[in-house]
């Protein structure tokens, strides 16, 4: 997958050639099963039309600019989102910088600048409830109104239902709700994978060693979505170049919360991972923590 960081025709041609594109647009936070269903349709339609498949997304969640006080926590960081998008087989992702100026752009201008001028759009595939542009004024009908005079088609898709039969469509909001309740399995059912967090091990207070359970204090970006406080069964991969262990994955017990034994009044959740069968020093190493099951809530011991 090519990553394009400028919404210009020159940048797009350099990445995927002078060809037309079938496009989908969105925040794509989590790259969940609903997103993957849309991208599969984009790829299929692009192949049928002899075009390239492209995801148009943003360098930050639009809500973090438009309404920062209520912006959702993210299911994926920027790097993980690109990795997951690449795994769908899409030809390219255009990452549009999102700032106050972008937030104020009229939907018609966005379509002309990004889709028509930069991407030479041949088709647009989005959810039937898709909105975009200034004050979310753009929608499927606006795309259809513009399509006739600009030679592209619009194919709206319905929401993807959950595989477990629950009457709730797959969405980033539903996944965040599941995580907030500690239901990492329900989140995984909608993500199509287990939820994960990445971070660097900080110094912590090392008091866990005094009670026989040395833990790694993983510093996770504050913008990311943490599951509910509690203890989880997890798998932890050491991503950094620690000798003899880089790339190795361990079973782990992960505690999310205020560490009630030592920090009853902590102001924010902390992530501590105890890697089974690992006794080395993890300080300053980058870890990937994958949540498999909720074990119990926090309790002081």
Where are these predicted regions, by residue range?
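Conserved beta-strand elements of the Class I
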Residues: 21-23, 54
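Positively charged, low-complexity intrinsically disordered leader regions
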Residues: 1-21
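Phosphate/ribose-recognition catalytic cores of enzymes acting on nucleotide-derived substrates
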Residues: 150, 204-301
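Short, glycine-rich nucleotide/cofactor-binding loops
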Residues: 24-36
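Classical nucleotidyltransferase
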Residues: 101-214
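General small-molecule cofactor/ligand-binding pocket signal
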Residues: 2-4, 93-96, 153-157
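Core alpha/beta nucleotide-donor-binding catalytic domains of modification enzymes
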Residues: 36-119, 126
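Residue-level signal for inorganic ion chemistry
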Residues: 32, 85, 124, 187, ...
